[in-house]
Amino acid sequence: MSSSSVARQPAPAGGQDLVVDRLRWWDLDEVLDLEGALFPESAWTPGQFWSELARVPESRWYVAARRGGRVVGYAGVFVVVPEADVQTIAVATADQGRGTGRALLRALVECAQARGARVLHLEVRADRPAALGLYESMGFEVDGRRRDYYGRGRDALLMSLRLPSGSSDAPAPDRAGA
């Protein structure tokens, strides 16, 4: 997904369209609110988000999902050809099950592929069946397990998706607003 790309997903009846586009620094207040609500024990700090955004577009790319102008999800990818790694993906509780996670993940897959990655890795808590189901439905396969990665009794599953050869000649995203 280049800086000029915007993905739109039609809304369910009575809802608002979902728009996925570049995460900007001015989105961070909403992102940090979501981060704290969704990951209270391991939330990224403002400094961690700023550090990640400072690496856009060289090796990182972050997107936000919006409904009605409000951030309802965000995701990021780290690309070092020939591999890429999902750094984070999060969807507001009220927006889960509405295709938001799928739209965010699709944007990361497109970005990784456009930058020449051949495989996309991620880790997911083993006790998150909805997330695991999403990843499997998009072709990710379990490669391994990290015991107690998220704390005692909370394992991480390591997953990967083989990417078809993409164009590494895709336009590089601009740094405006990073």
Annotate each language-model stretch with its function.
Residues S3-V6, G15-L18, R22-A94, R102-C111, ...:
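Acetyl-CoA-dependent GNAT
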Residues E30, G133-L134:
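Well-formed, non-transmembrane alpha-helical positions, independent of function
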Residues F39, F49, Y74, L134, ...:
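Conserved hydrophobic/aromatic "anchor" residues
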Residues R98:
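Flexible nucleotide-binding loop
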Residues L105, R128-A131, D148-G153:
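Short glycine/proline-centered loop/turn elements that form peptide/ligand docking sites
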Residues H121-E123, E136, E141-L158:
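Conserved catalytic-core motifs of GNAT/GCN5-like acyltransferases
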